């Protein structure tokens, strides 16, 4: 089975039913619009939207869960997708924080991928360590055998943060820049540096260096482009 990763664009529509994006619509109207937006988007990839598990960017429980066909909603921050998942698709919500995708193989060659969203709170609460530990548990692979992909996100001169949120020195040491009484975070460096501490091979860490605040493919609150994209992961027999 081939691991496929694909990302919605602004042209595909806002991947959310939140009122803040559609203030004039009723709850029923927002839900209907969201359902139809998902169906249209996934139909382009020949994926049944009923087989899609949404990973909300509000999830804060730093635990992992293996996705199965019976799962409809999740509260965990990390979802695990196996190559035997029979067409299930995990779609992670993305606005200003990167989606993190990590993969590892078992001794018999089967693949497992972890999907999570690198919000400040989740990273501060050792999300990356839990991703590594979850893949070790599922595959018995060593951290240096794992591969990480980090999606587009704001550049280091765009992501303004409150220093009070960065309480975990293991994650945030030497990752901020002060300019005109404002603090900006180099979130890519924070992720890279933390993964190195977790004994991940630096040659196996891949970043999409696109600045999501300026690139027109992506929604971004920081870039005054309110909305959400979906970063989607699925195992299929063919490349999508």
Where are these regions (language model features)?
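Short helix-terminating capping/connector loops at secondary-structure junctions
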Residues: 46-48, 139-145, 200-202
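Intrinsically disordered, low-complexity, positively charged segments
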Residues: 7-45
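Short, well-ordered amphipathic alpha-helical segments that serve as non-catalytic structural scaffolds
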Residues: 31-41, 125-139, 190-194
């Amino acid at each position: 089975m081939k691991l496929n990763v694909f990302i919605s664009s602004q042209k595909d529509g806002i991947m959310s039913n939140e009122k803040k994006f559609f203030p004039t619509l009723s709850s029923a109207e927002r839900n209907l619009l969201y359902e139809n937006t998902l169906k249209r988007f996934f139909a382009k990839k020949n994926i049944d939207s009923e087989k899609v598990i949404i990973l909300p960017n509000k999830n804060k429980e730093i635990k992992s869960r293996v996705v199965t066909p019976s799962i409809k909603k999740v509260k965990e921050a990390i979802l695990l997708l196996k190559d035997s998942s029979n067409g299930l698709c995990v779609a992670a919500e993305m606005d200003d924080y990167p989606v993190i995708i990590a993969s590892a193989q078992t001794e018999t060659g089967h693949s497992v991928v972890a999907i999570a969203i690198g919000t400040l709170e989740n990273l501060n609460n050792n999300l990356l360590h839990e991703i590594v530990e979850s893949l070790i548990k599922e595959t018995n692979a060593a951290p240096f055998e794992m591969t990480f992909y980090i999606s587009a996100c704001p550049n280091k001169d765009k992501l303004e943060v409150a220093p009070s949120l960065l309480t975990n020195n293991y994650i945030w040491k030497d990752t901020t820049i002060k300019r005109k009484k404002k603090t900006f975070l180099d979130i890519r460096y924070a992720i890279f540096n933390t993964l190195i501490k977790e004994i991940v091979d630096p040659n196996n860490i891949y970043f999409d260096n696109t600045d999501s605040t300026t690139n027109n493919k992506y929604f971004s609150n920081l870039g005054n482009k309110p909305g959400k994209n979906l970063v989607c992961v699925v195992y299929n027999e063919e490349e999508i």
